[in-house]
Amino acid sequence: MGILDIDALSVSYGAISAVRDVSIEVGEGQVVGLIGPNGAGKTTTLAAISGLLKPGSGSIRFNGNDTTGKPPDEMLRRGMALVPEHRRLFKTLSVRENLLVGGATASSREREERISEAFDLFPVLESKQSTAAGFLSGGEAQQLAIARALMSDPSLLLMDEPSLGLAPTLVNVVFELIERLGEDGRTLLIVEQNATRMLKAADRAYVMRSGAIVASGTGAELLDRDDLFEEFVGGQ
C-alpha cells in the first residue's frame, strides 16, 4: 500500500465519461508522473484526487484513509497540497506574503522556518520577497506557486502541468527542482505533457489515453517504449 492508492476511479461530466477505471499507486518518497496527450483525463484525475471533483465510482485512499469525495480543505488538512495548472497566486501580495498564506495553519515559528527553507530552495524568491506576485516572470511565479504549496509541509504534493507555457531554460529549472524535491524525499504526483522530461525525473509513471491508463512502469522503462510515444503520447 502506498501513501496514495487509487482504485478503479471513474469520473463523468454528465453523460461524458472523462476518466474510466483508473488505478494508481504512489509510494512514499516517490516521484510519479501522469503523462499523455491533451484530453486524456490527467487533470480530471488530479482534480478528483485533490477533492475538486467527486468521482462517480472507485476509491481514493490517502495515508491509509478513505478520502473519496472529500473536499479540498480537508485534503489540505490531511497533508495533501496542489499546485494547479493556473497558478492562482495573490498577485497584489508580495512573495513573502504569498508564502505566509501558504503556511497559514502553521505556527509563526514554523512559518519563518519554512520561508527560510523556501528561500534556500528558490534563491530567486529571496531576492524578490518584497515584490508583488503580479510582477514576477512566468518562471518565478511557478517557483512561488510550488514554494507556497510546500509551506504546509505536505506529505503529498500534486502538480498540474508545472512546465506549461515556460521557455525551455525555465522548463529545465522546474525539472531540476522536481528532481531535487525527489532527492529530498518528497512524495510527488505530477501531471505533465512534456513526457520525456517527466519520465527522466520519475521513479514511476502512468500513461493515460481517452480517460484510461494504457501503460505504466518506471520512467526508464517507459522511455524505451518508442511505440508508446508514437501511439499514446504523440512523439513528445
Segment roles from a protein language model:
Residues 58-66, 78, 111-113, 117:
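Conserved ABC transporter NBD signature motif
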Residues 132-136, 140:
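Conserved ABC ATPase signature
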Residues 14, 70, 95-113, 121-123, ...:
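ABC-type ATPase nucleotide-binding domains, specifically the catalytic core motifs of the NBD
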Residues 35-37:
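The feature captures the beta-strand-to-loop junction immediately N-terminal to the Walker
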Residues 50:
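Helix-to-loop junction immediately C-terminal to a conserved catalytic motif
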Residues 149-150:
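ABC ATPase C-loop
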